[in-house]
Amino acid sequence: MAVHQQPATPFTLGTHLSEPTGAHASAYGTITRRTTGEPLGRTGTIHTPHGDIHTPAFIPVGTRATVKTLTPEQIRSTGAQAVLGNAYHLYLQPGADIVDEAGGIAEFMNWHGPTYTDSGGFQVLSLGSGFKKVLAAEFAGTDRDGEVRRGKERMANVDDEGVTFRSHLDGSRHRFTPEVSMQIQHQLGADIIFAFDELTTLLNSRGYQEEALERTRLWAERCLVEHSRLTVERAHRPPQALWGVIQGAQYEDLRRKACRDLQQLSLESEERGGVGSVSYTHLR
């Protein structure tokens, strides 16, 4: 993650959408940069309610609120500063409400440190549509934007409102929207959560990448609105910071557009007096 160039010590990371303000502001504090002499350096500190993260950081994946084969103490001994959980898997099993009742993902897994959760978008689309089969079909020269599983019912379908998918566990049907993703992630209670986005492959057409990029931008707007509402509604819980996702596949101009769009969304949110925001990376 890049930081934007400025002479002062504080800096902002390139994927923030929103950070708490007001009564919750002190829980996150200021992201500070270490003195390195490099304006685009990645060394700094992210302050969260459950501790600091010194970047660059080793953050292992604990998909179902556990890092396989390791206890929390063993995780810490590896030098890990935070753990990343998965909204999709925890929603399916054991359920976001159970994690919420336990006090959030950190309490649920007995991890005394910062936590992240992703939005579930990658898993909904990669597991729901058989991502490996997508790539295999595309490399074989089939229609890149066509049906993923020809002759079979697709397990994931994207529309402008969200994604309808079938569970990889039992085939049951579910629906994720930006609002649902925010609701699940607020129940999971991670310090840093991510906006819902659409997964594409590097072999999708340029036209589809542009369409998906715009859909992801609109979903980020909806995520920010719902995140703001839930932050007020759940003021008794520790605050959470919302980060955006930069898409655009292999197209640099699309990735730059994603950064600019999300930066603008952050600034607009701040002007509206919402939860608060910090700006995206300035691209040159």
Regions found by a protein language model. Give the residues of each.
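Non-catalytic, usually N-terminal nucleic-acid engagement modules in DNA/RNA processing proteins
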Residues: A2-A235
